[in-house]
Amino acid sequence: MKESFKGLCNLNEDELKALLENSKTSIVIDTEVLLMLFQMEEKNSSELLDILESEWMSDKLWMPYDVGFSFMCNVNSYIVRERQLINNARKQLENFHDNVINMKSNPYLKDDVLANFKDTFDKIKTSFDSDINALDLELEKNTKKERIDKIFSQDKVGVNYTDAQLSELFRRGGERYGKKMPPGMDNGNTNERERYRDYIIWKEMQGFASYYKRN
């Protein structure tokens, strides 16, 4: 039964190892994974980029054109949005800090507890400031984006569809979305390329796997 429904069954450890070691296996990284690099702690994002840069992984990586297209269109706004989220959290923390400090005359707020609170506040605030500075630096220096660009060199990126091909994909995507057939979900985006992005990427992956006989 498992042979008939491979797509619905998890691979065991040996099967997964065999798949990863197969020279015909390609690994596709989605746009969201690339964007998350700008949300992670610097240590974690650097480690993930190190893995993607490793010779073993690099040989297997391939990027559908629309993954790269979506990443390039959204990465700067994503960084700005992350910066704003951190800044908002920082302001809320400062407001909470001020409210607590104003209660210092409360007899139940002991000096040692207040001191611990101030210490914790300073550590969290420093962490927020560090994250904001890292995002500002990324917008200025493009360090991570340059590493991603080198990882996905031109030969590892798919070819853009023609306007005629895109029109046909939009039509088919609309039919599937109307029937609630995955991949993808109708998010109401008026930009058809974004609206049918998951479907377009799926079709490009199918074409790549079929043409190059890849897993």
Segment roles from a protein language model:
Residues 2-214:
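Active-site-proximal, substrate-binding regions of enzyme catalytic domains
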